[in-house]
Amino acid sequence: MRKLAFQSYIFYLVILVLFSSVAFQNSALSQTQIKGPFLDQARFILRTDENLALEDIKSGSLDTYFYAIPNEAANDARNDPRLKVYDKTAGSLGFLLNPAPAEDPNILNPFQFKEIRYALNYLIDREFVVNEILKGYGSPLIDPFGIYSPEYLNIIDTVESFGFRYNPAYASNIISGVLSSAGATNDGGKWIFHGNPVTIKVLIRQDDAKKQSMGELLASELEKIGFSVQRDYGDLNKANVVVYGSDPKSLQWQIYTEEIGGTSAFVKYNPITAGQMYAPWLSGMPGSQNPAYWNYHNNTLDQITQKIAFFNFTSEDERNNLLNDAVKMGIQESVRLFVAQKTDPFVASAKIQGLVNDFGAGITSKYSLLNARSTDGNASVDIGVKQIHQGSWNTIAGLQDVYGKSIYFMVADQGTFRHPYTGEVIPFRSPWTEIVTNGPLDKLDVPADAIKWNQTLQQWVQAGEGSNAKSKVTFTPLYSNWHNGVKMDLSDMMYANYFTQEWGTDTGPGDRTVDPEFTPAASEALNLSKGIRFVTPDRIESYVDIWHYDKKEIADSAVFFPSEPWEILAASERIVLDGKLAYSRSEAQTKGIGWYDPIVREHAELIKAELQKMKNEQFVPAALKDTVTIQDAIKRYDASIDWIERHGHAIISNGAFYLDNFNPAGGTITINAFRDASYPFEAGHWSNYESPQLADITSVDVPRIVAAGQPASIKVDVQVAGQRNGNVTVDYFVSNKDGAVVIRGKAQPEALGQFGIDIPPEMTAKLSPGPNQIKIFATSNEALRPDISSTTILAAPRSVGSGQGANFNNQTIGNQSTAH
C-alpha cells in the first residue's frame, strides 16, 4: 500500500533496523553480500485445515504455517524437536452488531437500541470463551487494545471500571425493559413485535472452529432470553458481501462473529485503532460511509478519534485523556464488542531460523521472510496459508484481509517501518534527515514555492505567502528499480501525492474522483498537509500541521513512499472513472461492478489494455506533464505491459521479493527474491531482531494483609533474557472490590533487577475492606510486551496491622495468577 502523508487507514508495517553483519551464509548463495533476503523463493500454499498443516510441517512438506494451529495441539508441538512454536499475543475475537433500524415497520432490530447492544456484554461469558473455546490461550477482552498493548497502561482505569461479568439475568432484565418500551411483547417466552417474532440473524464463521463455537454460544444465549435466532454460516468471502458490502438497513445480518487480526506491525502509540474500531469516519463501521447505504453515525467519536489520529493535542496527558474518552464511549455504544484477546500458537519447522515474532503481526511479519534461512541449505520455503485470496489487493481501498496483507507486504516497501518489539517508528525507504517543530502551539513558515495539487485547476499550485505549519520533515527517498526493471524516480513520488489529494478531495456534485471509503479518511488528513517542496529528486520537504511529543511520529506522518509505479495507478484511475471497476468493496456492491483487484488476471488484463491505450494516445497525466516526457511514459507503459504478459497480474512493486505467480486454481502464490543491484538493503540487515529482550517477573513479595491507612511495601524482582537488568519499567495498579483502580504508580529501582513499591497511608486508606487486586506490569525498555503478575491482597482495619510477607516466586498461591 502507498504510504502517504496522513493516509489514515494505513496498514502499519514492520520497521527497518540499522545494518548488522551476520556470520551465517546460506550455502545456496554466494559468499559475497547479496541484496534482498537470504531466501531465493517463498511459496504460499493453501491449507485450510490447521491439523493437516501441522502434520505437513512435521513431515517436511511445509516449512511453516501462517495461521494458528489448534490450541489443543500446541503443548505437543512444543515438545516435538521437529517444530518450534511462536506465540502471537495480538488479535482478538468479538462481535460486530448491526444498529440499523429495519425498513419494514413491522420488523424490530433489537440492536438499534444502544442499551440492548450494551447488555450483550453481560450475556457473553468471556471466561468460558477463554478457558473452554480457546483452551486457555487468551485473556478476556472488552477494549480494542488488550492487556499486552503499550496503550493498555494508558486506559486501564477506564477498562477496569466497567467490571463486566457474565450475568444473563441482568442482561435479560435490561433487554426486556427496552423491548417492552418499543412495543414488543413476551408471549410464552418468545419476543413478538407486531405479530412477528423478534428475530436475530447471526452470520457465524464456520471456516474457523473458535469463531463458530463463539457464535453458537451467543446464539444459544439469545434464544434462552426469548429471541428467535436465524443462524447463517459462511467464510470471509461471504462476510465481505453480506456484512461489509451490504446496506445495513436491509438486515441481511445483525450479528457477525468477527476476528480482528491485530495491526500489521507492533505500534507504540496507536493513532488509528480506536477510530477503526469505533468511529464511522474510517469506514470500518456498518454502512462503510457509503452514501447509498444507511450509516452508523457518531460525530463525537469521529471528533475524538480524529484528534488522536491527526495528533491534535498539546501534551501526552491530553492525548491519553482523548484515548480514554474514545474507549469509554466505544464500549458504551457497543456496536463492536470485544470478547477475547488471543494467544495464537504459530508453528515452523525447527530447521527454519531467523523468523521474527513481531508483537503485532507475529511470524507473518515482513521481517520474517527477509531474515529467514534454512539450516539444510535450501533457499526456498513452503508456507501454508489458511486462505490464498479473500479480497482485493488494490492499494487504495483493498488489502483489508490479513491473508492478502501478509503476502503483499513481503513484496512492497514503505517509507517507514516499526520496530517489531518497541513499536517505535524507524526510517526505511524514506529516511528523514531533519525534523523541525516549535511545539504544539507555534508555527513554522511554509516556503512560498512549496506546492499542492489543485483539483479545480488540475495543476500543481504554490502555497504562496502566509502559509504556515507546525512541523517540517526533510527526507531522502531511497529509490530502486521497480520489479519490472524501470527505475523509480520523482514522478512516482509526485503521482502518489497527487492521487491522495485528487481522490481525497470531494468538491461536491459532479466530482467523479470520489470513493466512499477512501475519500472521507483521506480528506481529513489533507487538511493538515500544508505543502510539499521537491528540493531535488532525492530530497523532499514535507510541511504538516501536526505535532507529537515523539518526533518520530511526526516523521511517520509526513514522509511518503509509493509502492506501485505511477503508470499502474494512472491506468487503474482511468478504468475506475470509466465505470468498469471500483476501488472499494462497498462502491463495487452499489454499482454492481467488480472490486478492482490487480492480482486477478482479468483485472490485470484491463490494466494492460488501458496501458496500451495510454501508449497509443501518448498520454501523460496532468500531474506529471512538466516532469515526464512522452518517451519516458511509453517506456514505462511497455515495461508494465510486458510484466503483465509474463506474470499474469499487475502487482508491480519495489520490495525485497517480487510476486512471480498467482495460481488460484492450484491455491498457490509464489514470490521470488528481487536481486536487483539497485535494491538498497543487503541480506542480514534485520538479523538483530531475531530474539526480543523480554522482561520476566521472577518474584513478588507482598504482605498477606495490608492495614488500611498504614504504609505497605512490596518487592519485585525482574530479569531480562535470564539476567538481572535495570533497563525495565515496573508499573502497578490496585483495584478495589468494585474493579475501580484506586492506586497506581511506578515501582522504584533499589538494586539491579530489584524494584520497590511503597504505598503511603493515604493511598492504602482507599482500599476496600477484604480482597483487593494488585496488577504488576514489568516491561523491558527494549521489548514492550509486559510480564504481568496479578495478586489478591487483603485490606483490614488499621488495628489488625500488616501480616508477614509472602514470596510468591511467580507461582499460583491463593488468588494470584501470573501471565506471560
Model feature map: region roles:
Residues 29-40, 72-73, 79, 110, ...:
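Surface-exposed, Gly/Pro/Thr- and Asp/Glu-enriched linker/hinge segments
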Residues 35-36, 46, 69-177, 192-196, ...:
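Local pocket/hinge segments that shape ligand/substrate recognition
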Residues 53-61, 107-119, 123, 444-448, ...:
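Aromatic- and charge-enriched surface segment that lines or borders ligand/interaction sites
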Residues 118, 130-133, 230-239, 269-349, ...:
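Extracytoplasmic/peripheral linker and loop segments enriched in polar/acidic and small residues
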